[in-house]
C-alpha cells in the first residue's frame, strides 16, 4: 500500500456519539489510539485486525491526534510502520499544529526521516514497477491481454495491505533490502526480455482503486531464440533415459576417450542435456595418441611433511615406523628408497591398483610413539599398567584419596587417547531402544524416561564405558550373564581354579580401602560375618574341598554379633515344636527343618571377626553379590556404606570372590562344626534367669 495513500473503505465501527444539545459530532479516543501507544506483539496484531476490518487509520481524538501521533510519541516503530502501510498521514496536524513527524523521537524519528527522503512519485511509481516482476506480495499482479479482472471486495485493499505488511515489502523494511532486490531484479528483467514479446499489464492497487500500467512491447529477439511469453513445462530440458544414453554411446564409440581422473559426477552426454546448444569442434591434432590412452598419475601426498614443520619439532613429535607396504617382497621393499611415481603402461586386462603407501600407526606403534611423552599426556604405558595391577599398593591413610585414585585409574583405563577402535561403539549404536535399555540394566543403569536423540547419545557413552571396563579386566562384555549361576567374576575363578594376579591385586586394594574407612574412632569391633552351608553338598572331607563345592553348599550369608547365628536354629526348633506355618513360608527355616528331618547336622562358619557393623555389612553384601541372591535363602541383598556405594558390580563381585577364597582357607584350618537340634540352648541367653522386660516384674528371690 502506498505510504500516503488513503483508505477509502467504509469503517464498520459505530458512528461517533453526538451531544443532545448541539448535535455536533464529538470525537473521542478510539481503540487504535490505545493500541498505538503499546509496543507489544499482541497490540500490533490487534491493530492490524482492526485495520483489516475497516477501522479508520486517520481517526482523530478530541485533541485532533491520530493513532500515528501516539505511536510517534511513544517511539513505537512497529506500530508506525503498520499505520503507514494502511495509509496513515505523517503530516496531519492536531489542534495545536503538531504533526506526527514533528513529535517523533528515537527510532521512529529515524524511520520517518528515511521515509520522507524519497518523493511520492518514486514511492508510488518506481519501486512498485521495479519490484513487480519478482515480488511475492499480493498487491501486484501480471495478467494477459484482454483478460477481465475480478471486482474487489470493499475490504480487499486493507487485506492486501495487511498481507504486504506481514510478508515485508520494501517500505516496511525501511529499504534495508533494496540493494539485494536490485541485484536480483537484473536477472528477472533479463529473463522477461528474452521470454516475452507480448504486452504486459501491471495491475497496481492504490487508494484511488485499480490502476493498469501498460508496458510497451519489446522488439522480437533473434530467430535462434525460442521466444515465449513465460516459463512453462515445455521449456524444461528432457531428462535422458537409458535408451538415449545408450544411443549416444553407440554414436561416440568410435572416437577415442580420454581416461582422466573424474570428478565423481555422472557422465550424461552433453547433446542430450543441451539439445539446442551447438557442439564446438575440439582440436585433436595437437594431442598425441599416447596421451589419450594413458592414465594420468596424480602425485601422492607426503604424509610425513607435517613432522618437518617447526610446530611439530617444538612439540617433540617424530614420525614412527609405519606398517610394511603391500608388496610380495617386504624385505626388498624396505631397503629400496621410494621412487617418483611413473605413468604405468596400459594393458588389455584389468590394471592392478598400486600399493597403498599411506603411512599409518598400529596400536603398539602408537604406544611407542607416545612413550617419551607419557608424562605430558598423563598416560601410562601398557607395561606400567600390568606392573601396577600385579604389585599391591601401600595402604593409604585417607579413604577418600584412595577411592578417587582408583576411579582415576578406571577412567584412564577406559578413555585414553590411544584407545583402538574395537567396534564396541558400532555395536551399541545398532541396538534398538529396548535392547539398549536391557543392556544398561545389566550394569545397574536405569534410563529415566524415553530415549531421544540427545539422551540416547549419553546412555550409549555410559554403556561403552561399562563394556570397556569389563574388557580391560579380562571379561567378555557379550557373555550371557543371566545364564551364569554365579557372577561372571566368581565363574572365572571357579573355571580357572585360582585367583589371577591382577584380580587378587584389585581385591586386596578394595580390602585395604574398606579396612581404612570403617576402622578407628567411632566404629565398634564386635561384629562378624557367618555362612550357613548344606552338609549334603559340602561333605565331610575338608582337605579335598574345592572352592566350587564350597560355594555351591552355601545357602545363607549373614552378619551379626554374639550369638546371632544361633537365632536362626532356635527359631527353626521352636517352629518345629509348635508346627507353625512359618516353616512353609520362610525358605531359610524350611531348609533347616528339611536337613534336621533327614538327620544331618548343619555346618556354620564365622569369618571376619572383630570388625565394625558397617564393615561387616559391606563384606556380607559383597559375598551375596558374588554368589547371587537367587542361589541363597536370603530375603534381600546386602547393604553398602560409605564410598563402597559407588562401586560397580564388577568391583563388588571381585571383592566377594576374594572373601570367599579366604573363607575356604579358614574353614580348612578350623574344620567343620555341626549344629543339631539337641545341642541347642533354650534361649540365646541361657545363663540369665529373667531378661529385662520379660515377665513384667522383678526377678523372684531365691527361698532360704
From Swiss-Prot:
Residues 425-470 form the LEM domain. One of its GO terms (biological process) is response to UV. Residues 276-288 have a biased composition (Basic residues). Changing residue 659 to F: In op444; severe reduction in endonucleolytic activity. Severe embryonic lethality of progeny of adults treated with X-ray, UV-C light or cisplatin characterized by chromosome mis-segregation and formation of anaphase bridges. It comes from Caenorhabditis elegans. InterPro entries: ANKLE1, Ankyrin_rpt, Ankyrin_rpt-contain_sf, GIY-YIG_endonuc, LEM/LEM-like_dom_sf, LEM_dom. Inhibited by EDTA. Residues 1-29, 247-293, 314-358, 381-421 are annotated as: Disordered. Transmembrane segments: none annotated. It is found in: Cytoplasm; Nucleus; Chromosome; Midbody. Residues 525-635 form the GIY-YIG domain. ANK repeats lie at residues 28-59, 63-93. SUPFAM superfamilies: Ankyrin repeat, LEM domain. It comes from the Eukaryota. Changing residue 192 to A: Increased sensitivity to ionizing radiation, decreased localization to the midbody and lack of phosphorylation. In a RNAi-mediated capg-1 knockdown, delayed midbody localization and persistent chromatin bridge formation. This is Ankyrin repeat and LEM domain-containing protein 1 homolog. Endonuclease which, in association with baf-1, plays an essential role during embryogenesis in the DNA repair response following DNA damage probably by ensuring proper chromosome segregation. Also required during postembryonic cell divisions after DNA damage caused by ionizing radiation to ensure normal cell proliferation. Resolves chromatin bridges in late mitosis that result from incomplete DNA replication, defective chromosome condensation or unresolved recombination intermediates. GO terms for molecular function: DNA endonuclease activity. PANTHER family: ANKYRIN REPEAT AND LEM DOMAIN-CONTAINING PROTEIN 1. The gene is lem-3. Phosphorylated. Phosphorylated during telophase when localized at the midbody. One of its GO terms (cellular component) is condensed chromosome. Its EC number is 3.1.-.-. Residues 8-22, 329-346, 384-405 have a biased composition (Low complexity).
